[in-house]
């Protein structure tokens, strides 16, 4: 566990999945950094393989950002409605809880995605192909094979030809609205899954100019937030301490730490991915300014 300090993705232990058409390696960045709720991972899917059996979470939104490669998003609401969509670098996918069952299929060059999940309270996942429910470490019906093995026994997943028009839940970053601004050393140029309708998850990319900060020093009372560096360098500022960041660095901050944090961008700029959950009632505290924000647009002294 990182004790609230940055880690590098390559240093996080890899978990291997190989079951029939499923062939992928997962690095659980959130777990390695002590996340309480957020599930964050980098998943490398082998060429021509799937990431998982098709599945739908009962109470957990998921979002994916394609970091490298290309492939297909497989989605189904039932046996009479099965679709695939082409996906590639910088595509953003949002899967609301209890929505279409989905999985990812890599193309001939493989597929690497950054996956973010808000965290489930029930750990219930439905797998329509095997007609099973995953219940945390167990599954139902209890007398059936484990879900990955059960999926493999069904043989290849039938794939329809890709649909040209993609749904509103799949967008390239370049298609999303750019929210940008600069005030002193604070700067942002953000494209965010919230512009696709997400109200429980943040998954946003910022093109940060050299020498800027992503925010004032702050901490949240209820939210977890995290950052992944796609390119460039800088430092993770934690109170008076500074920790280096480079491409592949990951940093997660738990809620209510009492210590302010921010990203300070180096001279080459930074492509920064910001992730987090959206918790009602969260208060953002700015210890240097001695102010807090109990609601959007309202900042008060303390």
Residue positions per predicted region:
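Conserved short histidine dyad/triad with adjacent acidic residue
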Residues: 22-26, 41-57, 187, 204-220, ...
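Short, conserved beta-strand element in jelly-roll/cupin
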Residues: 42-46, 56-75, 118, 205-209, ...
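Short strand-coil-strand connectors
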Residues: 36, 74-81, 98, 107, ...
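Ligand-binding loop in jelly-roll beta-barrel domains
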Residues: 97-123, 255-282
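Short histidine-centered beta-strand/loop micro-motifs
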Residues: 31, 52-57, 75, 85, ...
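A short, N-terminal "cap"/entry segment at the start of jelly-roll beta-barrel domains
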Residues: 1-37, 126-202, 283-302
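Short acidic-glycine-tyrosine-enriched beta hairpin
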Residues: 77-97, 240-257
């Amino acid at each position: 566990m990182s004790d609230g300090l940055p880690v590098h993705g390559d240093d996080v232990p890899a978990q291997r999945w190989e079951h029939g058409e499923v062939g992928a390696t997962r690095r659980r960045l959130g777990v390695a950094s002590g996340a309480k709720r957020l599930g964050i991972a980098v998943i490398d899917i082998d060429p021509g393989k799937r990431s998982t059996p098709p599945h739908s979470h009962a109470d957990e939104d998921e979002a994916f950002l394609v970091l490298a490669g290309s492939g297909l998003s497989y989605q189904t609401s039932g046996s009479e409605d099965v679709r695939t969509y082409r996906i590639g670098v910088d595509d953003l996918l949002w899967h609301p809880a209890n929505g279409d069952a989905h999985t990812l299929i890599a193309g001939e060059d493989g597929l690497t995605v950054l996956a973010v999940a808000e965290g489930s309270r029930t750990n219930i996942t439905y797998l329509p192909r095997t007609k099973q429910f995953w219940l945390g470490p167990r599954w139902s019906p209890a007398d059936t094979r484990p879900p990955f093995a059960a999926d493999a026994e069904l043989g290849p997943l039938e794939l329809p030809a890709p649909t040209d028009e993609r749904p509103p839940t799949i967008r390239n970053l370049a298609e999303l609205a750019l929210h940008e601004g600069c005030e002193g050393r604070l700067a942002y140029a953000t494209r965010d899954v919230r512009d696709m309708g997400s109200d429980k998850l943040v998954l946003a990319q910022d093109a940060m100019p050299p020498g800027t900060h992503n925010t004032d020093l702050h901490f949240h009372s209820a939210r977890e937030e995290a950052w992944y560096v796609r390119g460039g360098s800088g430092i993770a500022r934690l109170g008076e301490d500074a920790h280096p960041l480079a491409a592949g660095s990951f940093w997660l901050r738990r809620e209510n730490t009492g210590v302010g944090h921010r990203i300070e961008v180096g001279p080459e700029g930074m492509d920064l991915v910001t992730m987090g959950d959206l918790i009602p009632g969260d208060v953002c505290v700015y210890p240097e300014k001695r102010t807090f924000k109990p609601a959007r647009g309202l900042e008060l002294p303390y």
